[in-house]
Amino acid sequence: YRIRNYTMKFPDPKIDSLAHLKAPRRSPLASAFRSSQEEYNQLVKEGTLFDRDILDKERERITTLLRWNGYYGFNRDYLGYIADSSFNQNVVDLDMSMKPYRKVLPNGSVEDQPHRQYYIKDVTVLTDYNPMGVGEDASFMATDTMLSAGVNIVYGRNGKSIRPSVLRRSTYIRPGQLFSEKNIEQTYSAFASLRALRNVNIRFTEVEERDTMKLDCYILTSPAKIN
């Protein structure tokens, strides 16, 4: 089968606009951490073969664009296709569809809601997190807390094993920003390059504030050498 007609139009104008984004002009000074140009190239096109692998990659591509632009709760399972091959001409008409966000209410029922963008509220870096700790080692004991350019830095038992400015510069997730998976990837990469740290783990907690969805971010790290 070949695709005769292909439609990708979503009822939410903001999501529809993001799904049709064109690649921004790349600065020669831009980070080479991840080439994002491919994410802006539509994979499903009229006249091409009907290929299930390509259809799945297109769902992944749009999911990536949305998660780069605030849609923390979005995943590829919200996207699907409606295919019509009733023409008996080895062609198919294809529409991409999007399911609404399904929120589980306190009473256990499920309510369909629009997909919402999330903003970063607070960012906290914990420098002595022990993911394998038991007993006393399982608890985090703060010995010092600092605020550096909006990032909370909490030192533990090992004290200031790394300068606050280094941790801040390695943190691409900042309060007030739209959630972006790209910022998470850059933060993981920056922290992985710090030899004084290991076992970096980034977690989020949802917070609803004045009808705005926000996320508290926790960057959990362990010192490479325990004093």
Region annotations inferred by a language model:
Residues 207-210:
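AMP-binding (ANL) adenylation modules
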Residues 93-97, 201-203, 216-220:
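Soluble periplasmic/extracytoplasmic beta-strand elements of cell-envelope proteins
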Residues 78, 203-204:
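Gly/Pro-rich turn-and-neighbor structural signature
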Residues 195-200:
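Extracytoplasmic/periplasmic membrane-proximal domains and adjacent transmembrane bundles
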Residues 1-193, 212-214:
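Interaction-mediating elements
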Residues 222-227:
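Transmembrane beta-strand segments of Gram-negative outer membrane beta-barrel proteins
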